[in-house]
Amino acid sequence: MLLLPLVAWGCTKPVPESPVDPPVVDTIKYYEQCLFRPGDYGSTNWRIPAICCLPDGSLLIVCDRRKYNESDLPEDIDIVSRRSTDNGRTWSEPVTIAQGTGRKHGFGDAALVVCENGDVVCVFVGGNGLFASSESDPISSYVCRSTDSGQTWSTPENISAQLWGSQATNTVCRNYRASFFGSGNGLRLTRGEHAGRIMFAAAMCRKGNSNTLDNFVVFSDDNGHTWQVSDRAYSGGDEAKLMELTDGRVLISVRQSGARGYNHSADGGKTWGTQGRWESMKTNACNGDILRLAATDRGDSRDILLHSIPNSMERRNVSIFVSYDEGDTWQDPVLLFDGPSVYSSMTLLKNGSVGVFLEENPNGACELWYQNWPVDSLIRQ
């Protein structure tokens, strides 16, 4: 197996450091680095960040290489990945996970999860655009996996028939003509009878002329080899993220304009309760991410969840909100980027810091930045 050399990709912005002791390897400080900007690697644009920390401590990112413009599918888009083995200070050259070959033959909107056996599962979509999709000319759902910490990837497998359309095992999903995944992080359950289950939030488009989206959870109990679909988790939804709570319930956080949407499942994501809105988190209709920082049932002194999302009714000022009550309320947003900024993804590093992969848009086109945050910079109480 060929190991790719690690390289530092420069466009790091200067960050003031405290003029104290000389650097110590284990000291966690804030730092940031631009990983993709317009024109890099021959691509006009880059979008749609996802990041995860792997069992060996390495970091894996994936994103869209939007070769000719910034538009979504059905444009010609590749999905690429990079790795870091030094907590995000240097990164490998990009590896192509799914290669687009022309309009209606591209791929995009990837999400990641690490399975119990260490495999990395990546789901994404390809083909037609979401709202133009039909069973005869669809946007398709794909899965591929890496068994070597993201260095190589399997050939993408089309799993659309398991999820929606006339062949779907969930008969409700036969009433839908398209589906896509909320890019960023999926979820692996670690508590209760469904421990080991992996899942992603999907937004499905109803048949007919309606562009209304509903959220379902796509889950697997065999590390992503076969898939099932939950009951409807959120009506009138969009891109969404999932989190396991300390009492074993699953929380879904749903993109909305204004107060962000949510719901809960008490049976491992299969059925869902009554949807609601978080008045404590009002934001632009945008994708974000949710991350567990601490859990009392694992020995921590309190429960802490983080949620990244624009702290604005516009796509700007992406921030991290904090919850100390398992997502009932959100507070104390910490600004990640002061200015136009859009999608974001988070992960917890082995050294205890928080890694963020973020779309910053200071000059009219997205740059994809990695930020490393000490936990004490994010928690204010």
What would you call each of these model-derived segments?
Residues E17-Q381:
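Asp-box/BNR beta-propeller blade signature and adjacent active/binding-site loops
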Residues A8-G10:
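C-terminal motif of bacterial Sec signal peptides marking the signal peptidase cleavage site
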Residues T12-P14:
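Bacterial signal peptide processing site
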Residues M1-L4:
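Sec-dependent signal peptide recognition
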